[in-house]
Amino acid sequence: MTEFVSRHIGPSEVEQTQMLNDLGLSSIDELVRQIVPDSILLRGDNKLPDGCSEHEALTELKELAGRNKVKRSLIGQGYYGTITPPVIQRNVFENPAWYTSYTPYQAEISQGRLEALFNYQTLITELTGLPVANASLLDEGTAAAEAMILAYGQSDRKIILVDSKIFPQTLAVLETRANPLGIEIKLIDLEETPDLGDISLAFGLIIQLPNNHGKLRHPDGLLRCAEVYKCMKIAIVDPLCQVLMQPVGEMGFDIAVGSMQRFGVPMGFGGPHAAFFATTDKYKRKIPGRIVGQSKDSQGNKALRLALQTREQHIRRDKATSNICTAQALLANMSGFYAAYHGAEGLKQIANRVLRYRQLLLSALKWCDVEVDESEGFDTVRFKGKKTLEDFNVRYEDGWTILSLDECTTCLLYTSDAADE
């Protein structure tokens, strides 16, 4: 304990005085004045209140937070209400054994953690119909950008075609990553006939399923054209919707990415949330991030390890194909446990309930003579007019009101005083 104290607790007042004397200084303030430039040195009263105890600070913060009017968010766009099973919240989300181990430095020692991540990867491959998945990435935007860069490396072309109804935050990340690489992003409207000339010049095609308006397209013709012109096909797909729809791998996509947030991970004011990345065997040595693989130990027993690490920068440095080792292991494990908790049939029930509520809301709006968008979709309702919903946050776009339903949805009611704006 004595050694720990001397190494990890700061110097005492006596030691501070001795160090100042050795420097020929009389106080820490004098030391600061000699180091910090005058232009940024804080002088005089900082106008901060007196210090208080932790309990007093928490009490005041709770009082301030209580002034907020909390509304249910139905904005969607990759962020949805979800129910975290109490057993996962207590034993994983709130358990330091899970949440402090943010990345497996000595991975093979932690076989339990690797098994949980292996379970997550298996979930992703079963959902997407693609054979290889990594152990998560930072968010959907990052995963989409990594998919773009993987596709870019397979061709000498410079153009990527992107669904114009992609989530805006994902498009922003794509633009940020594309600019320094000289990649040109060309937005396309999937509701119009694609220009074959555009496809022939592009190295990749990114489609959001469902899109920003909640529409669920089946771009079979576009995918066939992309295949002919050797244009890689990337799907950004909602995993809960994927439970009910044909796996994107079977549709013909080469890469699938998306956010696992709605698999039991709280919205958390926008994050953090685990993103998934799945692809074909052809690109398994180009896939970004960590991959957990199954092997055998020295006694021949099944053992898990981090696989294909020659892709990563701590092995190959400048020749690495993966320069992103940080993952969202805690949130990936939560979503994997969420799927195990509910099972395949439970996930289908949740997804079908969301779809059923969407259909009920559409019917109710039409009964009230409200113009609605009846395009095929999963969880999003789009109707004409701008309605004020007292207890909900929704989207308004070009004269339309847009809201997305989720696992927490039970019944949506317009109050009698809801008004057109």
Which residue stretches match the model-derived regions?
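Charged, compositionally biased N-terminal leader segments and the immediate start
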Residues: M1-P11
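N-terminal entrance/gating region of PLP-dependent enzymes' catalytic architecture
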Residues: P37-N119, I315
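Gly-rich Lys/Arg/Thr-decorated short loops/hinges at beta-loop-alpha junctions or inter-strand turns
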Residues: P96-A107, T125-G129, S155, A202-G204, ...
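Short loop-beta-helix segment that forms the pyridoxal 5′-phosphate
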Residues: Y105-I109, R113, Q121, T125-A145
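Conserved PLP-enzyme active-site core in the AAT-like
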Residues: T142-A145, I149-N301
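Active-site C-terminal subdomain of aminotransferase-like
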Residues: F263-C368, D373-S375
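Conserved PLP-binding catalytic core of the aspartate aminotransferase-like
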Residues: K366-E390, L405-C408
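Conserved small/polar residues in nucleotide/adenosyl-binding loops
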Residues: Y414-E421
